[in-house]
Amino acid sequence: MKKTIIILLLYFLNLSSAYSIEPDVFVQSTVNRASEILSKDISKEEKINQLKVIAKETVDIRGVGFYSIGSARKNLNEDQKNKYLEVFEDYFLKSFSSRLSEYSNPKIDVQDKDVLNKNYTIVRSILVATPDRPEIKIDWRIYTKNPDNPLI
């Protein structure tokens, strides 16, 4: 009986890792979702709201916020940290979504990935050039500590 339980446990652990999403697939899926929203015939306000949803699901806003504040974080008490994170999230989502909503049907192609360690992978992509803008290289730092829920 003990052997059966161990075998089942190992099977399910292996099965769960089989369903984890690869960082390059995660990035391509995320940019495809954003591109779909940007190509819809909806108001700019609705595009912004839908882009904010994607950002909340895929970006480690808390991590970006603490990275942005740097060592000053050590001088804040818990209430100040919470207030800062609240203000930073509002700023980040507003800035991110309003700037991105200016693009009309952007095409981003994932090129390759570089696994830095078990927690981070760099995914390289390009924003395809149009007559109005040059090609832009974009590197995404993907936090992969939880492979079932990678974050930008």
Task: Describe every region a protein language model picked out.
Residues 7-8, 45, 115-120, 134, ...:
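A broad, structure-centric signal for solvent-exposed, well-ordered loop/edge residues
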Residues 22-100:
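Early exported N-terminus immediately downstream of N-terminal targeting peptides
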Residues 135-152:
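Short beta-strand edge/turn micro-motifs at domain boundaries
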